[in-house]
């Protein structure tokens, strides 16, 4: 597991958080299925556990602050991201245990982590979510987030 602090979090985080809140407010979430991520008309997806994916494949959107982050990530850990999204957890929402075996590396980056937010569980180990911090790990590892006790836990996720 690798942990890194992103030096430009103050530029990126407010943008991603507002974008995600707007996506959730102004669209109807689709249930998770194979083609949903690549359908241009789909803006949000509900995952098992009821958390909401937004900003689907944001690494391909040509947003300056986002591109800066993904370039930094590639230089820092040598991963070319193939899929990305932002996931928002409100009270009572979670992400069930899963893994991404089709990718060598998975990462989670803290955008908004209110006091009392659930940690990321990676293969049974508790990893506290921290604003501005990337946690990268093998896509082979099972991970989950237990039911949130607060609104607004928001992270950027990607795989490569």
Mark where each language-model region is:
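Non-heme Fe(II)/2-oxoglutarate
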Residues: 1-77
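Catalytic core of non-heme Fe(II) oxygenases with the double-stranded beta-helix
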Residues: 78-147, 151-159
């Amino acid at each position: 597991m690798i942990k890194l602090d992103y030096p430009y979090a103050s530029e990126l985080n407010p943008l991603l958080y507002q974008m995600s809140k707007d996506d959730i407010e102004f669209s109807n979430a689709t249930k998770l299925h194979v083609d949903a991520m690549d359908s241009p008309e789909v803006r949000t997806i509900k995952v098992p556990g009821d958390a909401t994916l937004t900003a689907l494949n944001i690494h391909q959107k040509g947003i300056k602050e986002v591109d800066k982050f993904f370039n930094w990530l590639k230089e820092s850990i040598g991963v070319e991201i193939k899929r990305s999204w932002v996931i928002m957890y409100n009270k009572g929402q979670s992400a069930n245990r899963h893994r991404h075996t089709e990718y060598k590396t998975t990462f989670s980056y803290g955008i908004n982590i209110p006091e009392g937010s659930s940690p990321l569980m990676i293969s049974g180990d508790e990893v506290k979510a921290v604003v501005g911090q990337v946690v990268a790990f093998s896509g082979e590892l099972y991970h989950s987030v237990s039911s949130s006790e607060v609104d607004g836990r928001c992270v950027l996720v990607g795989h490569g």
